[in-house]
Curated annotation (Swiss-Prot):
It comes from the Bacteria. GO terms for biological process: gluconeogenesis. Mn(2+) binds at K194, H213, D250. One of its GO terms (cellular component) is cytosol. Substrate binds at R52, Y188, K194, R314. This is Phosphoenolpyruvate carboxykinase (ATP). PROSITE patterns: PEPCK_ATP. The gene is pckA. It is found in: Cytoplasm.
Amino acid sequence: MKKFDNLGLDNIKEIFHNLSYDELNAHEKANNEGLSTDNDTFCVDTGIFTGRSPKDKYFVKQDPSSKYIAWGKINQPITKELFDKLLTKAKQELSGKKIYVQDAFCGASLQSRKAVRFVTEIAWQAHFVKNMFIRPSQEELENFKADFIVYNACKCINEDYKQDGLNSEVFVIFNVEENIAVIGGTWYGGEMKKGIFSMMNYWLPLENKLSMHCSANVGEKDDVALFFGLSGTGKTTLSTDPKRRLIGDDEHGWDDEGVFNFEGGCYAKTINLDPEHEPEIYGAIKRNALLENVVLRADKSVDYADASKTENTRVSYPIEHIENHEPSLKAGHPKNIIFLSADAFGILPPVSKLSKEQAMYYFLSGYTAKVAGTERGITEPQATFSACFGEPFMPLHPTVYARLLGEKIEKHEVNVYLVNTGWSGGSYGVGKRMSIKATRACINAILDGSIAKCEFENFEVFNLAIPKALEGVESTLLNPINTWLDKNAYAETRDKLAHMFVQNFKRYEDVKEGIEFSKFGPKI
């Protein structure tokens, strides 16, 4: 117990430190934290919050980090005094109880990884951490020294939030200088995952390494592909490919040696999960995986079509559950980069080839649709712009990440493509969602290099290069104008979306790069 004195907890009844999967499973059952499915996958409810609470996330405003953080609606400041008050409150919540302490690494690169210690009173949250982060070896655990500590006091709420000037009873706070995060009022496991991701997005660029919200895989010829996109755009699904080894499904770094996963697991959406379309993910849901907010039938089988709790049903599992994963969790420099957008307006083509400058423009734009349930208050797709395809997790100015990406694209001669996994034939409510089959055909053509041999035409207003024909995709789909019955509505919607891009990009024109790249966007 003595080695845990620095946690600042009083009268701890018992500490369960780095439990095995079997031990965690036994604790989950003994604590009545959820149910087991028909194939012995444990299944939990995350309570009121079935997605992240972005309006309740704060960074402590203090030097030296305050001069690097891009303060605003996303990176909200909080005082050191208020942080101390809420940390004390969280520690009081965790004191006098049985607690779970789970140690893990974030980052598969030895030169870039961080050692993180998670403290919680809920067994399934320790299980989630064990699934999602990199599991240290026995020797590494014996010599483990935490770079960062996360106190997850999910049962603790801040009743004084109004007088404290905060958004709600929920709080997710990061103290960069003290290397501590504290979570209160939400049980959603994704807060821990994305919280440490946010910290990696602070640390790495300051070391001239790029941190990315993307998935990554590697082919038989060691050709690496990166897939950028917000939650629900298909990153996990499209990067899970039987012909390619999965490096990771969500968070990566890119340094002088190549690409490396931050995580040791995957966090996949399960709504309408179909074993035919997504056999790898379906097969990964077995003992040691952890299902969130799904509905069980009477026979304990999972009804993946049931969204009565949330559209954002999820499963976390160790990456070893994907048969075809890259065991080292890292690879060389990318050959192809794919930006995924779920276009709710049905305007963007299924696939477009981007120049380096256009790549910077669309990376900074980060256009997609927020898909139902990945955040509180979103019940249907809503068009949005999220810098770097992950603005909620980027503490620094977006152009810091864009500059690093541009340098790496140029240095390693990377091909960049924009792929629309959203709507075709009309906007949301009129058109239909692009089929996974068509999207897969576009991705395959990029990865096998056959798209480079296509004849391209210009997609007007957006000035994107789109293929005239592509194997496995109906030719009418390739140019969106052909899929809309009402051509006037199409032109009107196209111009409306182009205008939104232009308006959004004005926020970057306070810096040199922003002005430079603005000319590579749509021309109204």
